[in-house]
């Protein structure tokens, strides 16, 4: 069954997602939990936390400058306990250093906040879904989210899992060609039972919800066979290795910087959140069906080096040049103002966004459409 979308695409798009128990995501969750604790105790904390997980070892490193005290090991275990691990499963090694005084002075001086590093950040939105996110990314994330929700009902399912969705676009029509899921499981369940459970309880309900279900779709569940050993016991995990899963899949560009374990002075995170905030406003207002915002930054500088707004399938009333003018004039682009606008130091629990993508969650501050009315008035004045 083909689903109709507002704006045309052509060709195959493949999107993937991973679950909470994936080794890279375990690391992201620990890093963001440490960040949350630092900000909770001292909002001016500067955090650059990295986590490495392999076999029975969890290693936490990085640079942290804070007036608070965070028990890194205890914070890490809160994440691991939620995934069913016990204290016998891992040993922790902590190698946290203080942030360089040179970096600290460059980032925060004279009541200004400078960019914590150079870099390029990208935000994207499109009209394919109500979340203004690409359909493939939303479906891939929905699959692993649903599988996680039924673990209590089907305890042979474990938290390390991946999904992959192939969508074929022909203009304003899109069809799902295949769904792949690899799901860790206990030893006492047969592959046939696991496959039938995942197909009937996860894949079919999600495809039906998004209007994509079709008997021709190929369902691939654990195509490699049994998947009993998972998590860091099977594969090494590291923070920041799922940047495409965290954002927009194959649908948009990426600046290259990861998010987890970084405080809001790190523009890899803050710039990407703000770029999404802007792109979502543009699409929600009907100025374009698809929008990509790119912002480049210079280390220690409070304002961006460049801002570029690219729009596709633009409303005939407007032009890309006009949209760029309105956006550039309306928003305050300083790092400090972005942090304040998105409430990144007082209303965000970063751990919540370490899995299932950082975008499309309606409760996130960067997903709110607070500036719609003001932008609509401003663009009329420009015309």
Swiss-Prot record:
Residues at which L-methionine binds: 63, 99, 235, 266
Positions with a binding annotation for ATP: 22, 160-162, 235, 241-242, 258, 262
Region annotation Flexible loop: where it falls in the sequence: 99-109
Pathway note: Amino-acid biosynthesis; S-adenosyl-L-methionine biosynthesis; S-adenosyl-L-methionine from L-methionine: step 1/1
Single GO MF descriptor: methionine adenosyltransferase activity
GO biological process, any: one-carbon metabolic process
Keyword Protease on entry: no
Cofactor(s) the record lists: Mg(2+); K(+)
Domain of life: Bacteria
GO cellular component: cytoplasm
Keywords recorded for this protein, A-Z: ATP-binding, Cytoplasm, Magnesium, Metal-binding, Nucleotide-binding, One-carbon metabolism, Potassium, Transferase
Reaction equations catalysed: L-methionine + ATP + H2O = S-adenosyl-L-methionine + phosphate + diphosphate
Coiled coil: none
Pfam family, one: S-AdoMet_synt_C
Location within or outside the cell: Cytoplasm
Binding, Mg(2+): 24
EC numbers: 2.5.1.6
Cofactor note: Binds 2 divalent ions per subunit.
Binding, K(+): 50
Record-linked NCBIfam families: metK
Subunit record text: Homotetramer; dimer of dimers.
Family of this protein: Belongs to the AdoMet synthase family.
Its job: Catalyzes the formation of S-adenosylmethionine (AdoMet) from methionine and ATP. The overall synthetic reaction is composed of two sequential steps, AdoMet formation and the subsequent tripolyphosphate hydrolysis which occurs prior to release of AdoMet from the enzyme.
PANTHER family: S-ADENOSYLMETHIONINE SYNTHETASE
Protein name: S-adenosylmethionine synthase
Naturally occurring in which organism (per UniProt): Mycoplasma pneumoniae (strain ATCC 29342 / M129 / Subtype 1) (Mycoplasmoides pneumoniae)
Lineage, opening ranks: Bacteria, Bacillati, Mycoplasmatota, Mycoplasmoidales, Mycoplasmoidaceae
């Amino acid at each position: 069954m083909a689903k109709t979308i507002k704006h045309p695409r052509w060709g195959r798009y493949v999107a993937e997602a991973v679950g909470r128990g994936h080794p890279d995501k375990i690391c992201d969750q620990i890093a963001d939990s440490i960040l949350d604790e630092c900000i909770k105790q001292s909002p001016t904390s500067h955090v650059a936390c990295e986590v490495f997980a392999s076999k029975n070892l969890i290693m936490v490193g990085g640079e942290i400058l804070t007036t608070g005290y965070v028990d890194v090991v205890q914070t890490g275990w809160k994440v691991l306990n939620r995934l069913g691990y016990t204290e016998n499963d891992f040993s922790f090694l902590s190698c946290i250093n203080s942030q360089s005084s040179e970096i600290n002075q460059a980032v925060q001086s004279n009541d200004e906040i400078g960019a914590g590093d150079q870099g390029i950040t990208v935000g994207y939105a499109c009209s394919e879904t109500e979340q203004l996110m690409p359909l493939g990314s939303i479906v891939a994330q929905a699959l692993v989210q649903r599988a996680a929700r039924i673990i209590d009902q089907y305890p042979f399912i474990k938290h390390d899992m991946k999904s992959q969705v192939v969508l074929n676009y022909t203009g304003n029509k899109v069809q799902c060609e295949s769904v792949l899921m690899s799901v860790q499981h206990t030893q006492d369940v047969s592959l046939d039972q696991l496959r039938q459970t995942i197909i009937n309880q996860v894949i079919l309900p999600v495809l039906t919800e998004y209007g994509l279900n079709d008997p021709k779709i190929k369902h691939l569940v654990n195509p490699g066979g049994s998947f009993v050993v998972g998590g860091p016991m099977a594969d090494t995990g590291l923070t920041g290795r799922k940047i495409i899963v965290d954002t927009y899949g194959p649908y948009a560009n990426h600046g290259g910087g990861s998010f987890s374990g970084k405080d809001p002075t790190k523009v890899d995170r803050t710039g990407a959140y703000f770029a999404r905030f802007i792109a979502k406003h543009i699409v929600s207002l009907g100025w374009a069906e698809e929008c990509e915002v790119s912002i480049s930054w210079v280390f220690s500088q409070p304002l961006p080096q460049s801002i570029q707004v690219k729009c596709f399938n633009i409303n005939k009333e407007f032009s890309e040049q006009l949209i760029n003018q309105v956006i550039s004039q309306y928003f305050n682009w300083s790092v400090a103002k972005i942090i304040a606008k998105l409430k990144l130091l007082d209303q965000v629990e970063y751990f919540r966004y370490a899995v299932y993508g950082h975008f499309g969650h309606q409760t996130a501050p960067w997903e709110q459409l607070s500036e719609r009315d003001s932008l609509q008035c401003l663009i009329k004045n420009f015309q």
